[in-house]
């Protein structure tokens, strides 16, 4: 079961929530809490409507969804869960200048945030790996069916459930953040024992480092594949140059996905690692809240990156332009199939991303 926190004598080796008096009292000024509250309110509203719209539009064409789209929609589910289940707790607490939901609410909020956050990251990992295999190994797209996507979703939720439930069964806990109006995984457990260090290291590796490595590897390989493929077929027909715009867009999308994730979560991860293995008291309270607020913004712009840009919801702008572009690419595909077999395979890469 989760640890039962009670007041203990003052000791520098104790975590902040055991030695700083009321752990749920805000350590920020009223003004800072109000700013944080309004910021999270705006982020929460935009995220809820953005991800809700994505799910609504997807439900209208649910029978036509491709396997990769099904996995990507799961990202919107995770982000919507963070916005609906998590953000109201912090927003109310910011406006009240203290955490008002007690230890039970703290553990629920910490679990929900970690659960949907982990699910979101693992979904990103699955999508990036799927795209890497489909772009770099064309035969992969032939056998991937909708049922495989649903199996992948089940594995994602099982993975997230396993790691986020472990702190509730005695291997850790969810505790207040140093600034008092939010809760998180007990990173400070690593300061107390070797067992705590092992647990935190496992969390960091399986829920952050490994997924991040897969995402970066996948998109670097995709970028390299698209660039090399363009060079191989560019001299066969001048019409291949029309795909250069698409190539640049794909490169930018991959960079946005990686950059968006890194910008949102790496600062929070750095602070968490320092809290676990460094000198947590050396981090100013006012500074510790910034990575938390930044990480919470990921639920807002993820639907923009994954749904609007990558899956081209904006393609509804002009049907004529889309039809012309499709016709041009299909014509070139037929031409290359009859002349150079290799070039047709490469063109599949570009069409797969359209």
UniProtKB/Swiss-Prot annotation:
Source domain of life: Eukaryota
Tissues expressed in: Detected in brain and retina and cell lines derived from neural retina.
Gene3D superfamilies: Rhodopsin 7-helix transmembrane proteins
Post-translational modification: It is uncertain whether Cys-315 or Cys-316 is palmitoylated.
One GO BP annotation of this record: cellular response to UV-A
Family recorded in the similarity comment: Belongs to the G-protein coupled receptor 1 family. Opsin subfamily.
Name listed for the protein in its UniProt record: Opsin-5
Source organism of this protein record: Homo sapiens (Human)
């Amino acid at each position: 079961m989760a640890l039962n926190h009670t007041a203990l004598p003052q000791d520098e080796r104790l975590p902040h929530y055991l030695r700083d008096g009321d752990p749920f009292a805000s350590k920020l000024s009223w003004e800072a809490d109000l700013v944080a509250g309004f910021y999270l309110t705006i982020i929460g509203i935009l995220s809820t409507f953005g991800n809700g719209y994505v799910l609504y539009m997807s439900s209208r064409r649910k029978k036509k969804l491709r396997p990769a789209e099904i996995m990507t929609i799961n990202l919107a589910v995770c982000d919507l869960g963070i916005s609906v289940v998590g953000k109201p707790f912090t927003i109310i607490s910011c406006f009240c200048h203290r955490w008002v939901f007690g230890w039970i609410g703290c553990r629920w909020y910490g679990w929900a945030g970690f659960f949907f956050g982990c699910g979101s990251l693992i979904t990103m990992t699955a999508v990036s790996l799927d795209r890497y295999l489909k772009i770099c190994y064309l035969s992969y797209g032939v056998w991937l069916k909708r049922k495989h996507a649903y199996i992948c979703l089940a594995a994602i939720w099982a993975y997230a459930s396993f790691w986020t439930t472990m702190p509730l069964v005695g291997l850790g806990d969810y505790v207040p953040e140093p600034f008092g109006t939010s809760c998180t995984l007990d990173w400070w457990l690593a300061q107390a024992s070797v067992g705590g260090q092992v647990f935190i290291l496992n969390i960091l590796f399986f829920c952050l480092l490994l997924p991040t490595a897969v995402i970066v590897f996948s998109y670097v390989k995709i970028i390299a594949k698209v660039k090399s493929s363009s060079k191989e077929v560019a001299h066969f027909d001048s019409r291949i140059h029309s795909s250069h715009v698409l190539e640049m867009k794909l490169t930018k999308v991959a960079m946005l996905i990686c950059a968006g994730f890194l910008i949102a979560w790496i600062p929070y991860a750095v602070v968490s690692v320092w809290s676990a293995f460094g000198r947590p008291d050396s981090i100013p309270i006012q500074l510790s809240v910034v990575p938390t607020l930044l990480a919470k913004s990921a639920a807002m712009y993820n639907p923009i990156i994954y749904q609007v840009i990558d899956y081209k919801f904006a393609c509804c702008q002009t049907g004529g332009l889309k039809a012309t572009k499709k016709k041009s690419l299909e014509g070139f595909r037929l031409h290359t199939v009859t002349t150079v077999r290799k070039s047709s395979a490469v063109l599949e890469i570009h069409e797969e991303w359209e």
